[in-house]
UniProtKB/Swiss-Prot annotation:
Listed GO biological process terms: riboflavin biosynthetic process
PANTHER family in UniProt: 3,4-DIHYDROXY-2-BUTANONE 4-PHOSPHATE SYNTHASE, GTP CYCLOHYDROLASE II-RELATED
A Pfam family: GTP_cyclohydro2
Residues that bind Mg(2+) 1: 27
Annotated residues for binding of Zn(2+): 255, 266, 268
Annotated active site: 327 (proton acceptor), 329 (nucleophile)
Protein name: Riboflavin biosynthesis protein RibBA
Gene symbol of the encoding locus: ribBA
Source domain of life: Bacteria
Length: 397
């Protein structure tokens, strides 16, 4: 149904249009996307004839600064915070609306000699400023267009147009599939673009290494930063893990209430301590401590979820009521850290099959799942049962 990212890149380099779909829980839309560097009046005409949406030009912050493109509004209330600048027409155009003149405006926007004064405001081309970090920071068509341009080695700017059906409704995936077939266009998803970038780019940096004596033994502690956000992660390494043999690994998501305060609402603290003790006993292994508090929703939202649980919601329902998925964690950064440590084959300490799938999706081999079950407490029996029933955790309760 969808094409590989590599196939889309090849077509884009040839000046062709591709269709890019976002998540069904986001806009659930498809856009025509082309590279701004190769834009022609014919491509613009195709987009406005068969896409029927608004023609926009995703650009980097650098273009906006050079051309003095101010935000369209001072207070952006768009649900997805799409970063429209003031609309523009090049001064050489007349009305600016024809396919030819829109293409001219886009071509001049990319001209390194162009200045802010070379464009009339408002106009018929709508620049959008992509977030630094692209789809890894914001999973929108704006960022997808700029990322695709960069991956093609082209100027970091694209041309996009939403695809609307003939009856005026938004085209969804079944409609987009028919459109792609009709015009022989490659179709990809932003989700696949995110995965492609995570696989092909190094996003973590080894920052500092120390010796860390603990109650469970002495570990080699390595601190990591990553280019996606400000979160810092730490790997506690025991023994020689460079032998090529499968290594005992625990990927532990931060839980301040459980790890530090000993909360009985969860089993996180006991799992952390048990994992460290088991790695120490084996004399070799890694505990990767990921700053993904509350299955990725953050400390305050976790406390809000606890409040909802006190009102009768279970842990999954509470997350969803707050507007989050049941589990927001992503294992791409963790996988890159494990690869930086030289690991390929793991014996994974976990009760969570999704964690196994998440790591294996980044070319790490999990040859064994090592159970890490803690005795249930009265306060967390219901929580653990929900993890079994709704999240698929492998626990014997």
């Amino acid at each position: 149904m969808f094409h590989r990212i590599e196939e889309a890149l090849e077509d884009l380099k040839k000046g062709k249009v591709v269709i890019v779909c976002d998540d069904e829980n986001r806009e659930n839309e498809g856009d025509f996307i082309a590279l701004a560097e190769y834009i022609t009046p014919e491509t613009i005409n195709f987009m406005i004839t068969h896409g029927r949406g608004l023609v926009c030009v995703p650009i980097t912050e650098g273009y906006a600064e050079r051309l003095q493109l101010e935000p369209m509004v001072s207070h952006n209330t768009d649900s997805h915070h799409t970063a429209f600048t003031v609309s523009i027409d090049h001064v050489s155009t007349t009305t600016g609306i024809s396919a030819h003149e829109r293409a001219t405006t886009i071509q001049e926007l990319l001209n390194p000699a162009s200045k802010g004064a070379d464009f009339n405001r408002p106009g018929h081309i709508f620049p959008l400023i992509a977030k630094e970090g692209g789809v890894l920071r914001r999973a929108g068509h704006t960022e997808a267009a700029v990322d695709l341009a960069k991956l093609c080695g082209a100027e970091p700017a694209g041309v996009i147009c939403e695809i609307i059906n003939e009856d005026g409704t938004m085209a969804r995936v079944p409609d987009l599939i028919e459109c792609a077939k009709q015009f022989d266009i490659k179709m990809i998803t932003i989700e696949d673009l995110i995965a492609y970038r995570r696989h092909h780019e190094t996003l973590v940096t080894r920052e500092v290494e120390i010796t860390l004596p603990t109650d469970f033994g002495t570990f080699h502690a390595i601190g990591y930063s990553n280019s996606l956000d400000t979160k810092e992660h730490i790997a506690l390494v025991k023994g020689d893990i460079s032998t090529g043999e499968p290594v005992l690994v625990r990927v532990h998501s931060e839980c301040l209430t459980g790890d530090v305060f000993g909360s009985h609402r969860c089993d996180c603290g006991p799992q952390l301590h048990a994992a460290l003790a088991q790695i120490e006993r084996e004399g070799k292994g890694v505990l990767l401590y990921m700053r993904q508090e509350g299955r990725g929703i953050g400390l305050l939202n976790k406390l809000r979820a606890y409040k909802l649980q006190e009102e009768g919601f279970d842990t999954v329902e509470a997350n969803e009521k707050l507007g989050f998925p049941a589990d927001l964690r992503d294992y791409g950064i963790g996988a890159q850290i494990l690869k930086d440590l030289g690991l390929q084959s793991l014996r994974l300490l976990t009760n969570n099959p999704r964690k196994i799938a998440g790591l294996q999706g980044y070319d790490l081999e999990v040859i064994e799942r090592v159970p890490l079950q803690m005795p249930a407490k009265e306060e967390n029996k219901s929580y653990l049962q929900t993890k079994v029933n709704k999240l698929g955790h492998l626990l014997n309760l």
